[in-house]
C-alpha cells in the first residue's frame, strides 16, 4: 500500500495527462514550427518523443540530438504517470548510462522547481529517489541483476563474480584446453583428430594455431542466441550445404557476372579514349583494338547468355574460358597511363578457379570438421563447468544465463514483460544477436523504442551485427503495423563545411553493398540551425598528403605506422591554428585507427612544445620496469634459487649491486657441486667459505648481509601476512615507492606500483591465496602473450587529444585531424586458415594430399592448401563486411568535427593518375573500385579524381619537404607575463574584486542557513538524527547517542573461509520473511522454511536467520498470537510519505519510510516494528528508536485520523524474542 498525504492530512490524488494521439502530435509539431523560439525541436524529434503504443525505430544521424530525444521521452513518460522504475533503458557503455542518468536527474530537478502542484512535486521527488534504482545501464549489468535474483532457477548461485581480466580467462582456458586435448589424442577417433590438428598447426606438438582456432570458435558462438544450438546446427551448415557447383549461391554467381560486365564496360571506356589508337595509319583496326573488341563482345555475350551457355554446372568451364580470354596482366596502357581494367576480374577468377578439384577434395575434410565441432562443444561445456565451480563467469555467460532464465520460466518472463512499460535501447546498431534475444524476451511485442544509426556501427570485432538494425528498418518500412521508423536527419553539431564534405564523400561512396546503407536523401546530414549554415572559407576540409616521391625513409618499413613527415604536417597546422586564430589546444583532436605505433606523434609534438594527451596504448603493464622489478622480487621471495629473478633483484635500485659485485659473488662456487645457484654462493660468501673468499671485501659483505636480512624478513612475512601487506612492506623497507617518484614518468610508475598491490589484494579476495599462486598466475599471463590493463593517470586539461576513432564515438571536437589515412585496412582475418560466419558456420583451408592427381611419384605425399567453397563464400562476405565497417569508421571520424576536418596521409604525387572516365559513371564509385581501394586516402582521391567537376567541399594538397623545415613549421607563441602595475587600469581586476565580495556574502549566507542547505528534499526517519546532530545546538534538543559495545562484547575473529554475514542483511531478510509469511496457517518450522524460499536473499543470509526465534515469537508471545488473531486488520511493509517543516530553516521537506506492521481498527491503530540489533538491556533500544516510532505514529494518525494507542518493538537480537512497549 502506498499513501501520500498533504499538510492537512488528506490523501493525494494525482491526475496524469494521457499520451498524445497522432493528431495531437501533428498539432504540437505545427505549434513548434510557428513558435519564435531560437532553438526549435524538429518535427521528427517531436514525433520520436511523444509517439506511443507501438514499436519505434529511430534512425538518428550524427549530431541529431538522439540523447536529447531519449531524455525528453523518458521525462514525458514520467509526467504521464509511468514510474521511472517501469522503464528498461539500455546503453552501450557504463559511462553513457551515467551521463543519461545525470541528464534525467537534472530534468527532474528542473521540473520540480517549475511545478506549483504539490501532489506533482511529491510524485516527481519520489521519481528522483527511484532514479538510482532504475534499470538504466548496460545489457551486461541488467543480466547480472536477473541472474543474481533468479539464478537459483537454473542452478546458478547468486554469489558469483565477473572475470573481467582477459588474462585470468586465458589461464582457465589453457587448463581446460590442455586436459581436453590429451583426452582427444587418446580417444578412438585419435587419427582423425591428429589430422585436424596438423591441418592448422602443422604438427601435434605445436598446438598454438589449433588452440587459437578453438578459442575463436568458442568466442564467436558466445555472441549467438544459444551457443550450444549454434554449434550443433549452424557450425557445419556451409560444409553440409555447399558440396557441388550447383550449390553455389546465386548472389556469388551474380557478383562474378557483374565483374565480367564491369570489365567489359571499363575496357570499352578505355578504347573510346582519344589517345587509345583504334586505327592504324592505313585506317584499318589496330590489332590491339581488335583483341579488346573481342574481349568486350565475348564477356558481354557470356554474361547475357550465362544460363543457356554454362549454368551453375558449367561454372568451372566459364572460369577457364574467361581466364584464357583476358590477358594475364591487370593493366591497359594509354599514353603511358596504366588503367587497372582487369584487376577486379582476376580477383574474382582466382576465387572460383579450380572449383572442381576443390570440391573433389572438400568432402575429405568433413570428418575433420566433425571432430572440431565435437572438440569445441566439449571445450564449451568443460570451460563452463570450471567457471561454475569457481563461481566466476564472463559477461557472455551471465547474458546466456539470463536468456535461459527468461526462456524456461514463463512466470519470470511475464513478470518482466508486465512490469516494463517500455524497453528502450540506445546505440541499437551495435547490438549482437544474444542481446537482441534478451530484449525480445523483455518486450511484450509492441513496446520497444530503439535508437541508433546504421552508419555508425563500428563494433563488428565485438560481434555486433548492423543487419539487426537494417532488418528492423526494412521490416517497419514494409509493414508499418510491426513498428514505426522515424528519421532524425538534422545535425546540430557541425558547421556546413563539415556537413557538406561528409555528404559529398559518402553520397559517392556508401551504399547497401559496401557500407550497409544507401547514403541517399534519407541519410544525408542537414544543418539543424541557421547559424550552422554561415560559411567560413578557412574551414574548408583539407586532404594534406606528404609527397613521398622523395621519401627520406622516415616511414616505418611496413608502411602501416604514421611517418615523421605526416606528424610534422599536423604540428604545423596546429601551430598555425593556435598562433593565428587563438584556438586552444583542447579544441583539437587527433583521430587514429589503432592505439599502436603512435609514439612518434608524442615525440614530435614534444619537440614543438605542443602538449598532448592520449587514451592509452598497448597493454604493457607487466613489462614496465618498476613492475618487472617487483615481480622478480616476489619470485625471489617465493624461491631464492631462481637465479634470473635473484639477479634482477640484486641489480635493482633496492640493493644496487653492480656487475663487479655479481662477478665476485659468482666466483664463490663450491667445487664439489656441478650446479651451484647464486643464492648458495651468496650464503657461502657471507660466511667466508666460498672458493675465493678474498674477493669479498667489507663493503660487499655489508651489502650481502643487508640483503639476506631483508630477504629473510620478507620470506617470513610472506607466510603470515597478505600479499597486499607484503608488497607495501617491500615498498617501505627499501623505499622503492619513493625512489620511482624521482624518476621519469614518476606519476605513471607510482600508479603502476600501487595497482600491483591492489591487484594482489583482488587476487586473494577472489579466493586464491598465497604468493606462489599469484606468481604462477602472472607467469601464465605472460606465457599466453597477454598483459594486464594499463593504469591511467590524470592528464593535463589544456592539451591536444589523441584517441582512436572508436574511442571518439559519441564525442565532438571543434577541430579534427584524421591521421594515417594511407594506412591499409587490416585484412588479416580474410587470410586466416578459417573464417566463421553466423549463417554459414565455419569455412576452412584444407591441407589436401593431391598425390593421386600427379600420377606416379616417389613422394610420400603432396600437400596443397585449398580454400574450400564454404571458406570462399565466408571470405567474400567478410571482405565486404570489413570494407563496410571501415567506411563507417570514416563516417564516425568525419562527423566528430564541429568546425573543420583535416585528412592526413602520404602519397606519390607523380603516380597520382586518372582512374576512369567520369562521364561513364553514375553517382557512386563502381563497386569493383570500392572493393579494390583499401585506404581512406584511396577512397578520397578516387572521389576527387572521378568527380572533379563537382564541388566536393575538400581540397587535395601535396606537402613537400621544403614546406616542413623548422622555419616553415614555425614555433608556438609563448604568452608574455603581465606587469603587476598594468592591472590598475584593468577592468577585469574590478570584476574579480566584485566577485570576491559576492563569494564572501554567499559564504555568510551558507553559514547562516547551514541546516537548510544540508537538508534534502526527502528524508527517512533513521536519517533525521544524522542530519541534525552536527547542525543543531544541543540546547533543548535530545541527541540520542548510539550505544557503544562494551569490552566484554569483544570476540575473537573467525578464521574460516566464509565471509561473515552482515547484520543489516539479516535484518532485511527478516523483514521480507515477516512480509510474506502466511498467517492463516499454523506457524512452525516447515511454514517458515516454505516462506523463506520465496525471499530474494542469498543462502548464507537465509541460513543465518534464527527460525526458532521467529517461531517462538508467534507461538510463545501474546503479540505474536495477536498477529494471527487479527490478521485481517494487519498491514505489513507499508510505505508512507508526509510533509514536515524543518524547525531550523523553516523549509518544507518530505519524510518517507516503510512501516513494518500496523493493525487498523475502527477507532485506533496498533504499531509494530522489528529490530535485529544486538543489545544488553531492552531499554537501550527503546531509547534509541523512540523518536522513530513517534514519527511512524504521526504518519498513521495524519492519514487515518485515528490515534495510535500502542507502539511495540519486537526485539530479535537477543537470546529470545522480547516485546517492548514504547
Swiss-Prot record:
Residue ranges annotated for the UvrD-like helicase ATP-binding domain, each copy included: 39-495
Task: Give the GO molecular function terms.
Answer: 3'-5' DNA helicase activity; 3'-5' exonuclease activity; ATP binding; ATP hydrolysis activity; double-stranded DNA binding
The protein's Enzyme Commission number: 3.1.-.-, 5.6.2.4
* UniProt domain UvrD-like helicase C-terminal: residue ranges: 524-810
SUPFAM superfamilies per the UniProt record, alphabetical: P-loop containing nucleoside triphosphate hydrolases, Restriction endonuclease-like
Q: Which cofactor does it need?
A: Mg(2+)
Q: Which reaction does it catalyse?
A: Couples ATP hydrolysis with the unwinding of duplex DNA by translocating in the 3'-5' direction; ATP + H2O = ADP + phosphate + H(+)
Q: Name one Pfam family in it.
A: PDDEXK_1
Query: What PANTHER family does the record point to?
Result: ATP-DEPENDENT HELICASE_NUCLEASE SUBUNIT A, UVRD / RECB / PCRA DNA HELICASE FAMILY MEMBER
Q: How does it assemble?
A: Heterodimer of AddA and AddB/RexB.
Q: Which NCBIfam families match?
A: addA_Gpos (TIGR02785)
State the protein's purpose: The heterodimer acts as both an ATP-dependent DNA helicase and an ATP-dependent, dual-direction single-stranded exonuclease. Recognizes the chi site generating a DNA molecule suitable for the initiation of homologous recombination. The AddA nuclease domain is required for chi fragment generation; this subunit has the helicase and 3' -> 5' nuclease activities.
- Which family is this protein grouped under? Belongs to the helicase family. AddA subfamily.
- List the protein's name: ATP-dependent helicase/nuclease subunit A
Amino acid at each position: 500500500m502506498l499513501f501520500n498525504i498533504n499538510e492537512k492530512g488528506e490523501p493525494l490524488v494525482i491526475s496524469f495527462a494521457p499520451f498524445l494521439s497522432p493528431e495531437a502530435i501533428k498539432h504540437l509539431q505545427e505549434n513548434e514550427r510557428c513558435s519564435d523560439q531560437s532553438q526549435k525541436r524538429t518535427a521528427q524529434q517531436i514525433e520520436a518523443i511523444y509517439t506511443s503504443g507501438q514499436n519505434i525505430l529511430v534512425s538518428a544521424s550524427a549530431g541529431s540530438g538522439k540523447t536529447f530525444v531519449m531524455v525528453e521521452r523518458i521525462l514525458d513518460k514520467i509526467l504521464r504517470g509511468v514510474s521511472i522504475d517501469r522503464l528498461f533503458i539500455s546503453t552501450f557503455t557504463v559511462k553513457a548510462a551515467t551521463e543519461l542518468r545525470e541528464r534525467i536527474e537534472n530534468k527532474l530537478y528542473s521540473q520540480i522547481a517549475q511545478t506549483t502542484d504539490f501532489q506533482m512535486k511529491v510524485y516527481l521527488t519520489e521519481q528522483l529517489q527511484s532514479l538510482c534504482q532504475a534499470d538504466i545501464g548496460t545489457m551486461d549489468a541488467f543480466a547480472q541483476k536477473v541472474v543474481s535474483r533468479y539464478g537459483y532457477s537454473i542452478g546458478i548461485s547468486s554469489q558469483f563474480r565477473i572475470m573481467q581480466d582477459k588474462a585470468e580467462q586465458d589461464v582457465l582456458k589453457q587448463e581446460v584446453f590442455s586436459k581436453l586435448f590429451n583426452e582427444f589424442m587418446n580417444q578412438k577417433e585419435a587419427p582423425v583428430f591428429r589430422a585436424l590438428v596438423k591441418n592448422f598447426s602443422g604438427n601435434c606438438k605445436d598446438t598454438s594455431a589449433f588452440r587459437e582456432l578453438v578459442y575463436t570458435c568458442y568466442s564467436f558462438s558466445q555472441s549467438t542466441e544459444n551457443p550450444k544450438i549454434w554449434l550443433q546446427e549452424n557450425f557445419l551448415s556451409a560444409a553440409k550445404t555447399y558440396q557441388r557447383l550447383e550449390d553455389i549461391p546465386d548472389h556469388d554467381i551474380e557478383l562474378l557476372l557483374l565483374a565480367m560486365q564491369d570489365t567489359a564496360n571499363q575496357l570499352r571506356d578505355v578504347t573510346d579514349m582519344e589517345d587509345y589508337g583504334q586505327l592504324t595509319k592505313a585506317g584499318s583496326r589496330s590489332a590491339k583494338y581488335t583483341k579488346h573488341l573481342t574481349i568486350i563482345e565475348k564477356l558481354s555475350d557470356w554474361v547475357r547468355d550465362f544460363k543457356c551457355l554454362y549454368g551453375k554446372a558449367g561454372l568451372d568451364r566459364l572460369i577457364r574460358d574467361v581466364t584464357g580470354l583476358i590477358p594475364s596482366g591487370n593493366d591497359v596502357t594509354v599514353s603511358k597511363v596504366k588503367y587497372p581494367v582487369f584487376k577486379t576480374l582476376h580477383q574474382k577468377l582466382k576465387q572460383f578457379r579450380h572449383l572442381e578439384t576443390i570440391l573433389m577434395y572438400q568432402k575429405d575434410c568433413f570428418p575433420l570438421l566433425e571432430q572440431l565441432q565435437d572438440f569445441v562443444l566439449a571445450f564449451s561445456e568443460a570451460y563452463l563447468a570450471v567457471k561454475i565451480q569457481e563461481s566466476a563467469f564472463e559477461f557472455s555467460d551471465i547474458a546466456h544465463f539470463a536468456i535461459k532464465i527468461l526462456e524456461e520460466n514463463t512466470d519470470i518472463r511475464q513478470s518482466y514483460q508486465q512490469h516494463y512499460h517500455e524497453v528502450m535501447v540506445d546505440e541499437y546498431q551495435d547490438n549482437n544477436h544474444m542481446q537482441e534475444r534478451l530484449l525480445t524476451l523483455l518486450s511484450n511485442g509492441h513496446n520497444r523504442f530503439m535508437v541508433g544509426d546504421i552508419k555508425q556501427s563500428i563494433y563488428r570485432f565485438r560481434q555486433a551485427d548492423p543487419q539487426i538494425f537494417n532488418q528492423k528498418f526494412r521490416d517497419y518500412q514494409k509493414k508499418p503495423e510491426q513498428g514505426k521508423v522515424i528519421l532524425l536527419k538534422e545535425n546540430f553539431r557541425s558547421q556546413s563545411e563539415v556537413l557538406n564534405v561528409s555528404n559529398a564523400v559518402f553520397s559517392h561512396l556508401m551504399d547497401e553493398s559496401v557500407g550497409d546503407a544507401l547514403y541517399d536523401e534519407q541519410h544525408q546530414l542537414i544543418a539543424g540551425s541557421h547559424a550552422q549554415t554561415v560559411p567560413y572559407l578557412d574551414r574548408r576540409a583539407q586532404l594534406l598528403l606528404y609527397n613521398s616521391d622523395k621519401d627520406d625513409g622516415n616511414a616505418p618499413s611496413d608502411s602501416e605506422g604514421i611517418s615523421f613527415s605526416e606528424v610534422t604536417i599536423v604540428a604545423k597546422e596546429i601551430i598555425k591554428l593556435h598562433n593565428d586564430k587563438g584556438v586552444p589546444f583542447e579544441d583539437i583532436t587527433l583521430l587514429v585507427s589503432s592505439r599502436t605505433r603512435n609514439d612518434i606523434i608524442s615525440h614530435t609534438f614534444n619537440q614543438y612544445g605542443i602538449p598532448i594527451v592520449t587514451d592509452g596504448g598497448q597493454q604493457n603493464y607487466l613489462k614496465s620496469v618498476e613492475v618487472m622489478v617487483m615481480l622478480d622480487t616476489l619470485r625471489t621471495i617465493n624461491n631464492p634459487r631462481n637465479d634470473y629473478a635473484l639477479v634482477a633483484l640484486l641489480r635493482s635500485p633496492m640493493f644496487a649491486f653492480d656487475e663487479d659485485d655479481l662477478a665476485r659473488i659468482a666466483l664463490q662456487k663450491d667445487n664439489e657441486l656441478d650446479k651451484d645457484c647464486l643464492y648458495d654462493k651468496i650464503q657461502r660468501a657471507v660466511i667466508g667459505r666460498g672458493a675465493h673468499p678474498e674477493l669479498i671485501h667489507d663493503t660487499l659483505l655489508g651489502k650481502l648481509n643487508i640483503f639476506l636480512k631483508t630477504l629473510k624478513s620478507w620470506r617470513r612475512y610472506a607466510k603470515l601476512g597478505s600479499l597486499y601487506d607484503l608488497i607495501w612492506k617491500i615498498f617501505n623497507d627499501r623505499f622503492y615507492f619513493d625512489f620511482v617518484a624521482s624518476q621519469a614518468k614518476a606519476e605513471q610508475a607510482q600508479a603502476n606500483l600501487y595497482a600491483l598491490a591492489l591487484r594482489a589484494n583482488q587476487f586473494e579476495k577472489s579466493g586464491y591465496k598465497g604468493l606462489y599462486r599469484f606468481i604462477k598466475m602472472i607467469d601464465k599471463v605472460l606465457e599466453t602473450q597477454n598483459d594486464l590493463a594499463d593504469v591511467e593517470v590524470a592528464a593535463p586539461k589544456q592539451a591536444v587529444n589523441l584517441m582512436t576513432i572508436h574511442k571518439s564515438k559519441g564525442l565532438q571536437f571543434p577541430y579534427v585531424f584524421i591521421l594515417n589515412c594511407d594506412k591499409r585496412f587490416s585484412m588479416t582475418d580474410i587470410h586466416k586458415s578459417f573464417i566463421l560466419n553466423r549463417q554459414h558456420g565455419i569455412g576452412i583451408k584444407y591441407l589436401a594430399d593431391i598425390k593421386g592427381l600427379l600420377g606416379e611419384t616417389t613422394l610420400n605425399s603432396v600437400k596443397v592448401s585449398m580454400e574450400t567453397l564454404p571458406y570462399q563464400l565466408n571470405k567474400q562476405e567478410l571482405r565486404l563486411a570489413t570494407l563496410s565497417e571501415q567506411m563507417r569508421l570514416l563516417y564516425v571520424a568525419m562527423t566528430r568535427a564541429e568546425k573543420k576536418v583535416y585528412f592526413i596521409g602520404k602519397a606519390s604525387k607523380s603516380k597520382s593518375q586518372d582512374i576512369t572516365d567520369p562521364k561513364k559513371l553514375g553517382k557512386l564509385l563502381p563497386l569493383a573500385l570500392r572493393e579494390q581501394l583499401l585506404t581512406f586516402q584511396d577512397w578520397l582521391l578516387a572521389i576527387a579524381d572521378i568527380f572533379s567537376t563537382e564541388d566536393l567541399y575538400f581540397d587535395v594538397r601535396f606537402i613537400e619537404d621544403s614546406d616542413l623545415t623548422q622555419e616553415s613549421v614555425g614555433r608556438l607563441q609563448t604568452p608574455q607575463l603581465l606587469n603587476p602595475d598594468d592591472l590598475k587600469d584593468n577592468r577585469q581586476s574590478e570584476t574579480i574584486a566584485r566577485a570576491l565580495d559576492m563569494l564572501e556574502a554567499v559564504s555568510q549566507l551558507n553559514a547562516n542557513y547551514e541546516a537548510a542547505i544540508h537538508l534534502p528534499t526527502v528524508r527517512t526517519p533513521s536519517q533525521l538524527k544524522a542530519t541534525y546532530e552536527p547542525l543543531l545546538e544541543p540546547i533543548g534538543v535530545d541527541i540520542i547517542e548510539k550505544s557503544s559495545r562494551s569490552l566484554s562484547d569483544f570476540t575473537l575473529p573467525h578464521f574460516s573461509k566464509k565471509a561473515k554475514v552482515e547484520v543489516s542483511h539479516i535484518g532485511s531478510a527478516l523483514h521480507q520473511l515477516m512480509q510474506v509469511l502466511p498467517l492463516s496457517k499454523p506457524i512452525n518450522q516447515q511454514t517458515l522454511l516454505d516462506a523463506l524460499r520465496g525471499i530474494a536473499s542469498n543462502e548464507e543470509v537465509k541460513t543465518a536467520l534464527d527460525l526458532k526465534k521467529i517461531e517462538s515469537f508467534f507461538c510463545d508471545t501474546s503479540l505474536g498470537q495477536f498477529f494471527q488473531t487479527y490478521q485481517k486488520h494487519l498491514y505489513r511493509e507499508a510505505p508512507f510519505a508526509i510533509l514536515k517543516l524543518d524547525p531550523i530553516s523553516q523549509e518544507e521537506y518530505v519524510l518517507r519510510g516503510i512501516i513494518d506492521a500496523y493493525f487498523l481498527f475502527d477507532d485506533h491503530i496498533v504499531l509494530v516494528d522489528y529490530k535485529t540489533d544486538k543489545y544488553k538491556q531492552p531499554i537501550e533500544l527503546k531509547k534509541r528508536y523512540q523518536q522513530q516510532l513517534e514519527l511512524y505514529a504521526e504518519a498513521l494518525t495524519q492519514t487515518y485520523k485515528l490515534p495510535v494507542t500502542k507502539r511495540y518493538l519486537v526485539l530479535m537480537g537477543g537470546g529470545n524474542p522480547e516485546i517492548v512497549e514504547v
